[in-house]
Amino acid sequence: MPAGSMSTTGYPGVCSTTSYRTHCYIPVTSSVTLSSSDLSPTFGHCLPSSYQGNLWLLDYCQESYGEAPTCKSPSCEPKTCSTTGCDPSNSSVPCNSPSAGQVFSVCETTNVSPSPSCSPSTQTNGYVCNCHIPTRNASKACQTLRNGSNCFGQLNCLSKSFQTLNHCRLSTLGYKSYQNPCFIPSYVSPLCYISNSCQPQSYLVRNYHYSSYRPTSCRPLSYLSRSFRSLSYIPSTFPPLRYLCSGSRPLKCY
């Protein structure tokens, strides 16, 4: 078998160690922006209404067909059976490539062997696959993956063609609707910013860099008299800054 490749029992060469996942881990520390009518309606990101750890969770965004890498074969993560016991989900799992236009959030964990066994001298490897075939102008809902107290979100806001992102999906996960917010990294300034222009910035998505957007010229604001077309609210649980803007009320940072 070529170096760097894996296969499951009965499915040789299907799996590759190269990651094609669309998970994106966005570090957030101390600064974000609010959306306003000043921002171009041809770009935007969906910000959540909740914050946990140091990650934002992004929800229900459109992506262009050419932005995400084509998943010729699903990525696979090895799972090793315990030497003291064997979980059926840890047995060898076939990694079937989805058909064109189909989105696989998580591959089905179908067991290859009917009754896998583990012993101290042998181990049974299994694979969990996550593959995604991008489609033109496809809208996808972000899922929340929880691992203990850690929360991770999938980034599907990968719009190289600047698709208009008008809303986030109202879901039971606590997301709220925003219109074209723009993310500002914490190294810009610990002040409030509104920007009229953004330029591409690469965020590391495992082994790939997807284009995202950040402000290229921002101006600090302590008061904003223009009327906002939509309410943008960053919850007070976000440390250490609090943001609130509604209509023509003052925009303040605390």
Swiss-Prot record:
Gene Ontology molecular function, alphabetical: structural molecule activity
Region feature (6 X 10 AA repeats of Y-[ILR]-[SVPC]-[NRTS]-[SNTG]-X-[QHRP]-[PSY]-[QSL]-[SRK]): 193-252
Keyword annotations: Keratin, Repeat
Summary of the tissues where the protein is detected: Specific expression in the middle/upper hair cuticle.
Superkingdom, natural source: Eukaryota
Cellular component, GO, one term: cytosol
First and last residues of every Sequence repeat: 193-202, 203-212, 213-222, 223-232, 233-242, 243-252
Additional detail: Has a low cysteine content when compared to the majority of known KAP family members. Possesses several C-terminal tyrosine-containing tandem decameric repeat structures.
Oligomeric form and interacting partners: Interacts with hair keratins.
Record function comment: In the hair cortex, hair keratin intermediate filaments are embedded in an interfilamentous matrix, consisting of hair keratin-associated proteins (KRTAP), which are essential for the formation of a rigid and resistant hair shaft through their extensive disulfide bond cross-linking with abundant cysteine residues of hair keratins. The matrix proteins include the high-sulfur and high-glycine-tyrosine keratins.
Family from the record: Belongs to the PMG family.
Name this protein carries in UniProt: Keratin-associated protein 24-1
Organism (species): Homo sapiens
Lineage, highest ranks first: Eukaryota, Metazoa, Chordata, Craniata, Vertebrata
Gene label: KRTAP24-1
